Amino acid sequence: MKKKTALLFFIWFLILECLAGCARQGYSCFMEVGDHEISKEEYALLAYDNIARTAREYGAKEGIDVNAPGFWEQKRDGVSPMDRVRELTDGEAVHQKGIQILAKENGMIDEIGYEAFLKQYQEENKQRKQMKEEGKVLYGPLELSVSQYYSYRQSQLEQALEEFAEQKIVTIREEELKAYYPVVKQAEEKKNFQAKLSLVIFEDAGEEQKAAAEQWIAAHGITDDLPLLLAEETGISASVESMAVDTLELGKENLLLDRVVQAVQEVEAGEVTPAIEYTDGMSAVAVVESKEYAAFGSYDTERDYVEYLLREKKAREYIADEISRLEVKKGKAWETLTYEDIIK
């Protein structure tokens, strides 16, 4: 009888210990990555944006109403929209928890549970409020949302982890640097250029109008009477401005210039870029009059830069490899995650 009682007690102890492993932090058992829990709440935080993405994917299919009752659980070809949300979220959840685990293992943070994160979040907003009251410079909103603080903290952790790996983990031989130099040279020479452009600026009246402007300008090019001809043939009123771009001399952040550079990067001299946002309510098409790529320096002059890029690359590969080794387990709650769990 004593043996039977002892056995039953042992079995109950194991059951309670398993339940405690999932409930230790006060959150529902959901997923585990490398023996560390991802709570339903943390997973839902990451899944939120994938609700909108999944709705767009299904909404683009003919005859599907994403607002219809039961939409999220209805299976089509064996897959429901919630299955798609889980598919999109799983990789991100494992990556983010992996960053936390590696940061903890390397002494950057002490706690990685969601409960500890919420305490840090509350403390951050408390400090921001205090800074405001003391008249100190405050960057960003007075009060961060949970999602904003999560993204900020994870970004900071990942950056710190990359820097740690670059300095403490990654080793580079001279032969590796020499082999990587041509890769960097090709990428840099394609990235940096000087260009002379003509910007055709017009009121943004939708995608059809932008496409019409792009096609007309590509066919006729830049002439002195472009505004008149474009208005007569398409009904689009426009003005023309000249612009010079040198990517090696880009200074302060300029969203317009950034958009221009990104568009011009994809085309060559004599070609026309897709329409870009110029200012609020206005679009522009850039005609590339000339474009010259900047020469990249020799191995000796650019060695430090090449090493910096290679260290960064190897650090990211190291982190990705370490995360890929972590065992991932999914609990029953993962299978029963609902739309309401995510948006509440």
Regions found by a protein language model. Give the residues of each.
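A C-terminal, polar beta->alpha supersecondary segment
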Residues: 28, 33, 44, 76, ...
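Sec-exported extracytoplasmic/periplasmic mature domains
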Residues: 48-56, 90-109, 119-134, 153-166, ...
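C-terminal motif of bacterial Sec signal peptides marking the signal peptidase cleavage site
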Residues: 18-21
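Positively charged n-region of N-terminal signal peptides that target proteins for export
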Residues: 1-8
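Soluble non-cytosolic domains of exported or imported proteins
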Residues: 80-84, 88-97, 111-112, 144-155, ...
